Curated annotation (Swiss-Prot):
<dbReference type="Pfam" id="PF01212">
    <property type="entry name" value="Beta_elim_lyase"/>
</dbReference>
<keyword id="KW-0663">Pyridoxal phosphate</keyword>
<dbReference type="InterPro" id="IPR018176">
    <property type="entry name" value="Tryptophanase_CS"/>
</dbReference>
<dbReference type="InterPro" id="IPR015424">
    <property type="entry name" value="PyrdxlP-dep_Trfase"/>
</dbReference>
<dbReference type="GO" id="GO:0050371">
    <property type="term" value="F:tyrosine phenol-lyase activity"/>
</dbReference>
<keyword id="KW-0456">Lyase</keyword>
<dbReference type="InterPro" id="IPR015422">
    <property type="entry name" value="PyrdxlP-dep_Trfase_small"/>
</dbReference>
<dbReference type="InterPro" id="IPR015421">
    <property type="entry name" value="PyrdxlP-dep_Trfase_major"/>
</dbReference>
<dbReference type="InterPro" id="IPR001597">
    <property type="entry name" value="ArAA_b-elim_lyase/Thr_aldolase"/>
</dbReference>
<comment type="similarity">
    <text>Belongs to the beta-eliminating lyase family.</text>
</comment>
<dbReference type="GO" id="GO:0006570">
    <property type="term" value="P:tyrosine metabolic process"/>
</dbReference>
<dbReference type="InterPro" id="IPR013441">
    <property type="entry name" value="Tyr_phenol_ly"/>
</dbReference>
<feature type="modified residue" description="N6-(pyridoxal phosphate)lysine">
    <location>
        <position position="258"/>
    </location>
</feature>
<comment type="subunit">
    <text>Homotetramer.</text>
</comment>
<dbReference type="InterPro" id="IPR011166">
    <property type="entry name" value="Beta-eliminating_lyase"/>
</dbReference>
<protein>
    <recommendedName>
        <fullName>Tyrosine phenol-lyase</fullName>
        <ecNumber>4.1.99.2</ecNumber>
    </recommendedName>
</protein>
Length: 458
């Protein structure tokens, strides 16, 4: 008999949550325009909208807040953050930002010029938007398996080397300022990249003089998957695997609101001094002094402490296994989800869940709204709404993946909460034929998934 295991932490403080009535939730989602982003958090029972900034900090992180140096310039909290990034990630230079998209903004302004192409292993919403705002064009060079929810490839986040080289041949290396490799790949279902693939991408970049950049937002989860799945890494600590992963990159953008276990903050890290200088020039305009980048000193202290906590092997094993616990319950019930189960979330396959709803009636959006009405669980659409429109044609981008993301915050919920979520999804699966499509009645010009509004189709 296998010995049971428990969360590798004790709970010191709690926040009450409440279940509401179905009638209350029907009114709430109607007032929110059937967009879960527009719900009030007090009306949500279990909040799986995102793992960004919604994590529980440790007592050490709360203690670190009191150590924050709030000096306007040269705060010692910056140097503690810099030391943590150098020690754990291995990059020479660090520029703090208010969150990940602040770092995306900086590197896009520094490296991208109009007419450039930026290859990557699947798009991410804010990343692509910043690239397009600078006149660049994102090109997806992820392996084909990433677009198949049922493909069992252990590293579905891998870059397709042939696609990458074909792009270089087509547009020329001088039109490619860098390749952006996400670790893990959010839009593919939290899927990892193998160490072997990172080495191959590095070789191509070196051959053609192209920089290799990382969106390292969930790189620790990626490192854990390498430990589990890639030969030669089973006995290595996650901390060591992460350091090797980062050694292949010239720099990274980072949202500290995920891996680093904080509520706000991010950074841009790099090895080239000229990029550091440009970043410092830009951060003063858009974020603040280069030693705070829009953050309070206390936030930099909490990020630094979180960087050390995130590479604890017991912590990251629990984090991955809690996500897996939910996903395996759904698989046992025959519910279509992205496989293998990813690092930060379970992704429902809305196409397979609601085959009667065409993609231009937003099946993932409809499923997320239905889940909230059923149980008060808030999830996120990751399909055609998130994909936005083609900036040249104005037509919808039609992604192959139409998903609902059940994103699990770190150290916040217990497995009993996961049982409630699983029960609700199973109930909806039985009632799936009653779910109707939606029409969009308000659409903002960019990042529409945040604030768009919908209504049911009769």
């Amino acid at each position: 008999m296998q010995r049971p295991w428990a969360e590798p932490y004790k709970i010191k403080a709690v926040e009450p949550i409440r279940m509401t009535t179905r009638e209350y939730r029907e009114q709430a989602i109607r007032e929110a325009g059937y967009n879960t982003f527009l719900l009030r958090s007090e009306d949500v029972y279990i909040d799986l909208l995102t793992d960004s900034g919604t994590n529980a900090m440790s007592d050490r992180q709360w203690g670190a807040l009191m150590m924050g140096d709030e000096a306007y310039a040269g705060a010692r909290s910056f140097f503690r953050l810099e030391e943590a990034v150098r020690e754990i990630y291995g990059f020479k230079y660090v520029v703090p930002t208010h969150q990940g998209r602040g770092a995306e903004h900086l590197i896009s302004r520094i490296l991208i010029k109009p007419g450039d192409y930026i290859p990557g292993n699947m798009y991410f919403t804010t990343t692509r938007t910043h690239q397009e705002l600078q006149g660049g064009t994102f090109v997806d060079v992820i392996i084909d398996e990433a677009h198949d929810p049922q493909a069992s490839h252990p590293f579905k986040g891998n870059v397709d080397i042939a696609k990458f080289e074909a792009l270089i041949d087509r547009v020329g290396a001088d039109k490619i300022p860098y390749i952006n490799v996400a670790l893990t790949v959010n839009m593919a279902g939290g899927q990892p990249v193998s160490m072997a693939n990172l080495r191959e991408v590095r070789k191509v970049c070196d051959r053609h003089g192209i920089r290799m950049w990382s969106d390292a937002t969930r790189a620790v989860e990626n490192a854990y998957f390498i430990k589990e799945r890639e030969e030669g890494y089973q006995d290595k600590p996650v901390r060591e695997i992460l350091k090797e992963m980062m050694s292949y990159f010239d720099g990274c953008t980072m949202s500290g609101k995920k891996d680093c276990l904080v509520n706000i903050g991010g950074f841009l890290a790099m090895n080239e001094e000229w990029i550091l200088q440009k970043a410092r020039e830009q951060v003063v305009i858009f974020e603040g002094m280069p030693t705070y980048g829009g953050l309070a000193g206390r936030d930099m202290e909490a990020i630094a402490q979180g960087i050390y906590e995130m590479v604890d092997d017991d912590y990251i094993a629990h984090r991955i296994h809690q996500v897996r616990y939910l996903g395996e319950q759904l698989l046992e019930a025959g519910i279509p989800i992205v496989q293998p189960i990813g690092g930060h979330a379970v992704f429902l396959d809305a196409r397979a869940f609601l085959p009667h709803i065409p993609q231009d009636q937003f099946p993932a959006q409809a499923l997320a709204a239905a889940l909230y009405v059923d149980s008060g669980v808030r999830a996120m659409e990751r399909g055609i709404v998130s994909a936005g429109r083609n900036p040249q044609t104005g037509e919808h981008n039609y992604p192959k993946l139409e998903l609902v993301r059940l994103t699990i915050p770190r150290r916040v919920y217990t497995d009993r909460h996961m049982d409630v979520v699983a029960y609700s999804v199973k109930h909806l699966w039985k009632e799936r034929d009653t779910i109707r499509g939606l029409r969009m009645v308000y659409e903002p010009p960019t990042l529409r998934f945040f604030t768009a509004r919908f209504e049911p189709i009769s």
